[in-house]
Amino acid sequence: YLSSGQEDLRGANGIVIVDGQVKVDGVSGGQELLLYKDGTIGTAAGVSASELVNRGVKYTFSCHSTQMIQNGDTSPSYREPKSYKRTCIGQTTNGDYYITTDLGYGNKLSSTAEYLKSLGCVNANSLDQGGSVTLTRNSEVINNPSDSSGERYVGDFLYFV
């Protein structure tokens, strides 16, 4: 389903919640992807990890997340002047998820948000951009990460089984 890849938490920045348990306490910076017990995705700024667990957060993902769509409304925070390679996740009312990976430099968050809305997504977040935009299938990388050194190491990942 969805899982946090954080195993060695000594260098973790911000907050870490795994399976509803606070692993690194602190205050959310608003750029973590939150996965609630009911499967809803979102972000929250200025909230302690303990309070997020009380609100039903099951996992946090450290991914420089920006909420593009919240409860069917396009969020004004997604507007940005540049286009980047990026990965985004959207969620429909029936709980289905869509993952998009933009491999070119022609898409802004606004166009990706509109695309996810056209698929019926009522919540959507960008996850990260640049060299961390790595798409795999059956353990094989199927895109070309943009950093000159190849894939960028990241502390978290999403996977679907």
Regions found by a protein language model. Give the residues of each.
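Gly/Ser/Thr/Pro-rich low-complexity, intrinsically disordered segments
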Residues: Y1-V161
